[in-house]
Amino acid sequence: MKLRIGHGFDVHKFGGDKPLILGGVTVPYDTGLIAHSDGDVVLHAISDAILGAMALGDIGKHFPDTDDAFSGADSRVLLRHCYQLALNKHFQLGNLDVTVIAQAPKMAPHIEAIRQLLALDLNTDIDNINVKATTTEKLGFTGRKEGIAVEAVVLMQQAI
């Protein structure tokens, strides 16, 4: 069986009047994230990881922020498109591991809902999806509550 690993990383700054959407879930918070799309930093990192595993570039290549067609775009639609590209190359998700790096908001109440949506969008068992959160102990931009960073790692396996 052929395996491929992909790593994704994304950062967005807090601001604006959009709702805060993380992993497809609307998370109650004072502000959303500044972005051309809906700003779902979790789904952007995962999309990048999938594209990376497939050697297909990054989300900026597929959904440029210079294209008005993607203004306010639903990142779940973008994620499903990236996953379809992997399926077209006969690869499917083996597992996904996501780390949300944020001082705020607290992620624990939202992790299971995020896992459920990811399992649905990636057509996989929830046991193949892990989402965890950490802080930077008040260090750096995430520690100062200026934004959120996310890392994602995927293992893609050749579909049989």
Swiss-Prot record:
A divalent metal cation binds at D10, H12, H44. It catalyses: 4-CDP-2-C-methyl-D-erythritol 2-phosphate = 2-C-methyl-D-erythritol 2,4-cyclic diphosphate + CMP. The keyword Lyase applies. InterPro entries: MECDP_synthase, MECDP_synthase_CS, MECDP_synthase_sf. One of its GO terms (biological process) is isopentenyl diphosphate biosynthetic process, methylerythritol 4-phosphate pathway. Pathway: Isoprenoid biosynthesis; isopentenyl diphosphate biosynthesis via DXP pathway; isopentenyl diphosphate from 1-deoxy-D-xylulose 5-phosphate: step 4/6. Binds 1 divalent metal cation per subunit. It is an enzyme of class 4 (lyase). Involved in the biosynthesis of isopentenyl diphosphate (IPP) and dimethylallyl diphosphate (DMAPP), two major building blocks of isoprenoid compounds. Catalyzes the conversion of 4-diphosphocytidyl-2-C-methyl-D-erythritol 2-phosphate (CDP-ME2P) to 2-C-methyl-D-erythritol 2,4-cyclodiphosphate (ME-CPP) with a corresponding release of cytidine 5-monophosphate (CMP). Homotrimer. This is 2-C-methyl-D-erythritol 2,4-cyclodiphosphate synthase. It comes from Shewanella denitrificans (strain OS217 / ATCC BAA-1090 / DSM 15013). The gene is ispF.
